[in-house]
Each structure stands twice: as C-alpha cells, then as structure tokens.
From Swiss-Prot:
This protein's name: Nuclear hormone receptor family member nhr-67
Pfam families registered for this protein in UniProt: zf-C4
Gene3D superfamilies reported in the protein's UniProt record: Erythroid Transcription Factor GATA-1, subunit A, Retinoid X Receptor
Inactivation phenotype: RNAi-mediated knockdown in males prevents migration of the linker cell (LC) during larval development resulting in abnormal gonad migration. At the L3-to-L4 molt stage, the LC fails to reach the P7.p hypodermal cell and fails to perform the turn from the dorsal to the ventral side of the body. During the late L4 stage, the LC turns ventrally but stays farther behind its normal position. In addition, LC polarization, which normally occurs during the L3-L4 stages, is severely delayed and mig-2 polarization to the adherent side of thr LC is impaired.
A GO MF label: RNA polymerase II transcription regulatory region sequence-specific DNA binding
Location within or outside the cell: Nucleus
Function: Orphan nuclear receptor that binds DNA containing an extended core motif half-site sequence 5'-AAGTCA-3'. In males, plays an essential role in the migration of the linker cell which guides gonad elongation during the L3 and L4 stages of larval development by negatively regulating the expression of netrin receptor unc-5 at the mid-L3 stage. Involved in the regulation of non-apoptotic cell death in the linker cell, acting upstream of or in parallel to transcription factor hsf-1.
Length: 416
C-alpha cells in the first residue's frame, strides 16, 4: 500500500505549483531547454526541432496570421504559433540537438543521480536539456532581458511591413515614438513577459520602476484582450498621429459596443496604462542588461540606417593624388596647340574651361563619381576633334606612367 501511494505521488512531485509554464501558463515541471515549462510544451518543442517541422499558421492569409492564442486551453490549436512562442521566450534549439540519449535511458538516469546527488523524482530530473546549470538569479535576468530583446527586434519587422510606402526617416520617427507601447502589447499578448515575472524575478531597475512596469502589465492582463483587439491596438499605437487612427477608433468602438458593452472604458484603460509607463523605466527594467549604457534612440537609428554603398574611390587609390597634375597637363597642351585649326582650338578651349573650374576646387571636395568621370574623359581622345587632329590630347596611358612623369617633373624643378 505504501509503495502504491509513493508511486502515485511521483508525477505530482515534479509539478511546480507556484511556477507557470512560460508557453501555455499551465503548471511547469521544471526547466526544459533553459525555460520553465510543462512536459507537454517541452515535448512538443523537442519533437518539432528534432524532426525539423515547418508549421503553417491556421489563420494564414488573414490579418490575425501568427497571432493565435497559446494557453492551456488553446495550445494544441495552432502548432505554428505554439512553436513561435517557444522560440520567442527563449527555448534553446541547440540543447535539443546536443541531447545525450533518450529520456528513459537507465544509464543516463543513474549518471544524473550520481552527478546531482538527487532522486529521480526531483524537479531537476524533469529538465532533460539543462546541460549547463546557471545560478537562478542570472538565468532569470537573462531570460527576461533576452525575451525583451527578441520581441524588440520582432517589432522592427512588424512595423516595417505596413510602412513600406513611408520614407525611412518617417519610419524611424514613428518607431522611436511608439516602440515601448508596442512592446508592452506584444509581451502581454504572447505572455512572453508577465507582471508576475517582473515583480518576482531578479531583474534590473529600481523597485519604483519595476512596480510601474508591472502595474501596467497587470492592468492589461486583467482585460483579457483577444487577438483581434491586440492587433487593432497595435495599429492604433503605430498610426495614432495620422488620419488612419480615426478609422481604427471607430472599429474599436464597434467591438466594444457589441462585445464588451459592460466595459465602456476597456480600451481607454489599456491605452492609459501604457502611457503611464515612462520609456526610461522600460529600458532600465527590461533592456539594461542587454544594451548596457548604450542609447536606445541611437540603437534604433542604426537599425533603420540604410547600408552604406562602397564608393568608386576605393577602386582608384591614387586618383586623388594625380588629378591636379592631370589637369595641369591639359592646360599646358592646350597652350602649346594655339596654332591648331580653329575648330580644334575651340574644342580645346572649352575643355580647358571645364577643367580649370574643377582645378579651383581641392581634390578632397570632389565627388567620387565626378572623379571617376574626370579620369576617363582625360585619358581618351576627344570625339569632337577634327579628323586632322589624330594624336591623343596627351600620351598618358596609365596611372603608373602618370606617376613616373610626375616624378621626373619634380626632379627638374629641384634642379632649377
């Protein structure tokens, strides 16, 4: 009888009643792949990664694609969104790939009992992937900060898709103004970061800052918004300073009148709760471990900055040194050719005027493209010249020859 009772109590001893699964909010059974989760979500994640599953959201093609609710009741309805949430909260794919054998291996069980000095019923045994065990405070801090960072980078893509027709500078300004509100909405929608975590886990920021952020999360969590409401609130947040916000307000009012008639301040509570959080508090509480002393506005500016294109000057490292000499050579040849036919003389005069205006500027101020064009036009015969003038305007055929001529002239000047 005693044996039967102990066997029946084995499964319940692994359940942590005070720690929720980060994926579906059911009771967790310990850390799986670096995250507190239940056996169901841990097993789903392991199978998906090992078999390289490619899921498709059940709402594909609709505005709510990729926004399916994942909780204890709905966790089996959309595998794509369940796997996405597992990755968003920080489940480690590498831990799945490097597992050392099957879960029920008796040899592995005995080895772990010997290494950790614990019974097979301890919560640590439920964590099949914790090859590296970090201190609790460090793990929690990294988890919250890492999750916030992943959400932040996901929001950049979320904002850029509907803003394709908006200039980059305007995109950056809109994201600078609204990223904090969007992050709170996305974190509460996916339950990737909760008010309970912010209050209980060891994270950065002062106690006042943590309470302010946790209070806002708590208010939004109590409203229990659905996916459609979250989506519309995100779009309202992003477009609130544009005429498009008016249409979104009408849609929210319609939802409130038909679905939440008894909650006339439902969306006002959400908007006010987000507005009450200083952006500096969100940065200090959720991002300071990730970005250190870096400036968040500067980080956003760098993310929206277009990639720099290589300049043509990199192809001609000696061009800046030789341009002035090349232009002076043009001037000398033009003066020596005063007895050439009138048509040819006019052409040379025009070319001299153009080059002399360029010579008045310093080489460092020239545009790289103009520099490239100047070199090409100076090393080829003029197509406008008369047929009688068959010789090239100068005999320089390469940068190497140009350098040698320049050295000879410098020697002659020194002798004089």
């Amino acid at each position: 009888m005693m044996t039967a009772v102990s066997q029946m109590s084995v499964p319940s001893s692994r359940i942590l009643l005070d720690v929720d699964c980060r994926v579906c909010e059911d009771h967790s059974s310990g850390k799986h792949y670096s995250i507190f989760s239940c056996d169901g979500c841990a097993g789903f994640f392991k199978r998906s990664i090992r078999r390289h599953r490619q899921y498709v959201c059940k709402n594909k093609g609709s505005p709510s694609e990729g926004q399916c609710k994942v909780d204890k009741t709905h966790r089996n309805q959309c595998r794509a969104c369940r796997l996405r949430k597992c990755l968003e909260i920080g489940m480690n794919k590498d831990a799945v790939q490097h597992e050392r054998g099957p879960r029920n291996s008796s040899l592995r069980r005995q080895q772990m009992m010997f290494d950790h000095g614990s019974s097979p019923n301890s919560p640590e045994m439920g964590s099949e992937s914790d090859a590296i065990i970090l201190p609790t405070s460090s793990m929690n801090r990294d988890t919250v900060a890492g999750t916030a960072a992943r959400i932040f980078f996901a929001l950049v893509g979320f904002c850029q898709n509907p803003l394709n027709g908006v200039p980059k500078e305007r995109q950056m300004t809109m994201f600078q103004q609204n990223w904090a509100a969007l992050l709170v909405l996305h974190a509460t929608e996916t339950r990737a970061i909760t008010s309970k975590q912010i209050r209980t886990e060891t994270i950065s920021g002062s106690s006042e800052q943590r309470n302010a952020v946790a209070n806002a999360f708590e208010i939004i969590e109590r409203l229990q918004l659905d996916n459609r409401e979250y989506m519309m609130l995100k779009h309202f947040t992003m477009w609130r300073d544009t005429p498009s916000a008016i249409q979104i307000v009408f849609q929210l009012a319609s939802i409130q009148n038909f679905t939440h008639r008894t909650e006339p301040t439902r969306y006002i509570q959400c908007i006010n709760a987000i507005a009450a959080i200083p952006t500096t508090s969100i940065i200090d509480v959720l991002f300071r471990p990730s970005i250190g002393s870096a400036s968040m506005p500067r980080l956003i500016q760098d993310m929206f900055k277009p990639p720099q294109q290589p300049t043509p000057t990199s192809l001609f490292p000696m061009a800046n040194f030789n341009l002035n000499f090349l232009l002076k050579q043009e001037k000398t040849e033009t003066e020596e050719g005063e007895d050439i036919e009138e048509e040819d003389d006019a052409t040379s005069s025009n070319q001299f005027d153009e080059n002399s205006s360029t010579d008045d500027r310093s080489v460092g101020e020239l545009d790289p493209v103009q520099l490239f064009l100047a070199l090409n036009s100076s090393t080829q015969p003029s197509s406008a010249s008369s047929p009688s003038s068959s010789r090239p305007r100068h005999s320089i055929r390469s940068i190497t020859e140009l350098l040698s001529i320049q050295e000879e002239e410098s020697v002659n000047v020194e002798e004089v």
